[in-house]
Amino acid sequence: MQKSLITKWLCISCIMVIATLVIGGITRLTGSGLSIVEWRPVTGILPPFSFESWQSEFAKYKAFPEYNSVNYGITLSQFKFIYLLEFIHRLLGRITALIYIVPLIYFYFKDVIKNRDMLPYIIALLLFCVQGFIGWYMVKSGLLNSPYVSHFRLAFHLIIAVIIYHILFYQLIKNRCDILLIPSQTDFKLPLIFSGIAITVVYVQIFLGALVAGLDAGLIYNSFPLMDDRFIPMEIKDNFFDLKNWYDPVFIQFIHRLVGYSVFLVVVVLISCLLKIEHPKLNKIAYFLMIALFMQVSTGILTLLYSVPIIIASIHQLFAIILLSIIIWCYFLIKSS
């Protein structure tokens, strides 16, 4: 009974984290992230209701660079749209944190979760506590002289959310005790190595994807597989190792493509390793990986070719998390054996 309760709690928490991630991505894609210019962790749980309240929020927004440089002349109705998107993202973050933290406290004091098992839950708790601050730290970077958030802070904000999800999802599958029953002589060395490598390169790719989003790097070189008929674009050919490139949209898109190829190759090798073991569970994971990889690659290419349509770009982000989840599941099953 207690195990089932923890499973349901972790499952709901994982779904809520994913929902917050996706809404956060849409908030970024629609340019809505700087519409709320204050951070009010407690009093900010309610949106403006009266016309006067909306006018007050709009007046605050007009005092910052984004209004004057990007959205000058927008109507109150247009402001409401971007404001509510950012509001929903922040509200989801708060609700997700509460859904995780309140039951965790209950489970701890009721001894449902033993002290020896608490470390990953505490780490996730600490990350939840700082994530709101990190989000505001990111937003604040776009409220100063430039109406654009720091792409590094954006990537940091995203990666913390992914780490939280990783911890919760791993505890979820661990709690379900979904282990393999395979003779001990079966060699798991290669699948274990490649699943670990796959997790690493997917993390790197998610980080780079956030940099692409932060610099609007998906709006240039909208061709595939080459960039203006070249593999390495002219802009970075002669100064490839210059650290300033990390502020260059062309360089960031190029690196995102390169790591994308790496993700594809590593996951294909992992699929091959899993199929060679000939175990039903691992075969199922291999097929799931094929589907997730196809969706991730195809939506990534379409996002680029069509200059970042919001729906396709959001699906692309979602499948990055789905792909990571399947690889984590694979890693757990192999390691548990």
Curated annotation (Swiss-Prot):
InterPro entries: COX15/CtaA_fam, HemeA_Synthase_type2. Its cofactor is heme b. The chain crosses the membrane at residues 6-26, 87-107, 119-139, 154-174, 192-212, 258-278, 285-305, 308-328. It catalyses: Fe(II)-heme o + 2 A + H2O = Fe(II)-heme a + 2 AH2. Keywords: Cell membrane, Heme biosynthesis, Iron, Membrane, Metal-binding, Oxidoreductase, Transmembrane, Transmembrane helix. It comes from the Bacteria. GO terms for molecular function: metal ion binding; oxidoreductase activity, acting on NAD(P)H, heme protein as acceptor. Its main location: membrane. It is an enzyme of class 1 (oxidoreductase). GO terms for biological process: heme A biosynthetic process. It is a multi-pass membrane protein. It holds the Pfam family COX15-CtaA. Heme binds at H256, H316. Pathway: Porphyrin-containing compound metabolism; heme A biosynthesis; heme A from heme O: step 1/1. It is found in: Cell membrane. GO terms for cellular component: plasma membrane. PANTHER family: CYTOCHROME C OXIDASE ASSEMBLY PROTEIN COX15 (PTHR23289), CYTOCHROME C OXIDASE ASSEMBLY PROTEIN COX15 HOMOLOG (PTHR23289:SF2). Interacts with CtaB. Belongs to the COX15/CtaA family. Type 2 subfamily. This is Heme A synthase. It comes from Rickettsia conorii (strain ATCC VR-613 / Malish 7). The gene is ctaA.
